[in-house]
């Protein structure tokens, strides 16, 4: 996988408005055909939408699970990340590390490896997302 050199704060992914960090950005570039040397690519197995965001989405969709899923996919398609435009909040994800950029692999003390399971403690509101559903999914409300 060819890697590009990115800004250490991730601003190379910001589309709109320019000059802000990814969490403050309205839209970020989630084009995964471009991978930067300071990024970690994960295959996501589970999205956990935060409570405020999920409640707002659920109410807007009348509790219809299909519509909820479509709305989440729409947010990610429009914004490049899961950041609810009404609440400003995101959530977190669970997944598996698929690729680690060279700048990170070479950092002293960095011990993450491809294939490791991972839980993101960084909000989805600042994490670029590209959702491609390759198998049936379900909506668990807990």
Where are each of the predicted segments found?
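Single conserved hydrophobic/aromatic residue that forms the stacking wall/gate
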Residues: 131-142
């Amino acid at each position: 996988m060819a890697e590009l050199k990115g800004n250490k704060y991730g601003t190379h992914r910001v589309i709109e408005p320019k000059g802000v960090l990814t969490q403050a950005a309205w839209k970020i570039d989630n084009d995964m055909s471009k991978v930067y040397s300071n990024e970690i690519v994960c295959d996501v197995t589970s999205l956990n939408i935060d409570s405020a965001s999920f409640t707002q989405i659920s109410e807007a969709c009348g509790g219809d699970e299909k519509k909820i899923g479509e709305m989440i996919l729409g947010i990610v398609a429009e914004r490049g990340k899961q950041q609810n435009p009404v609440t400003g909040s995101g959530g977190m994800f669970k997944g598996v590390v698929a690729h680690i950029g060279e700048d990170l692999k070479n950092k002293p003390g960095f011990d993450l490896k491809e294939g490791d399971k991972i839980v993101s403690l960084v909000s989805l509101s600042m994490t670029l997302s590209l959702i491609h559903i390759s198998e049936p999914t379900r909506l668990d409300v807990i």
